[in-house]
UniProtKB/Swiss-Prot annotation:
The keyword Ribosomal protein applies. This is Large ribosomal subunit protein uL15. GO terms for molecular function: rRNA binding; structural constituent of ribosome. Signal peptide: none annotated. Residues 34-43 have a biased composition (Basic residues). One of its GO terms (biological process) is translation. One of its GO terms (cellular component) is large ribosomal subunit.
Amino acid sequence: MDTVVKLNNIFSGLPKNKKSKVLGRGIGCGKGKTSGRGHKGQKARSGVSINGFEGGQQSIFTRLPKRGFNSLLKHRYSIVNLSTIQRLIDSKKIEDVSAITKEVLYNLGVISSIKEKIKILGNGKLNTAVAIEYDFISKSAESQVTLLSNVSASKE
């Protein structure tokens, strides 16, 4: 006795995905000529939306003052801490400590691009003598690296 109508047993007989109407193919298709956009005007044209336009009201980005600037001399480099390098050595992800290059750091996901410049910072403690390829190094990091081995860090 399944005479009770429930949400899970209603059958409409209609297709699940209704096909969208093809626009602009003559008056016989129901959406021909103006394709449901009305006659003329800005909204009838393609690329209708003007970014930041608020219907004649002055837009938010012209109401607010200009602030700051982007410096052309900004240092753009990846920062690698000595603690990160020591952690990778301890977890045996870096086997060859005699040549830690940009490629090695990139493959391990420490830096996001091989083209980036690298700055080594002395955050953390380094227990292993390593040879690191870098572009910049802090004084504390350089002292830790040179303390462990004679020829260790190399500027690219």
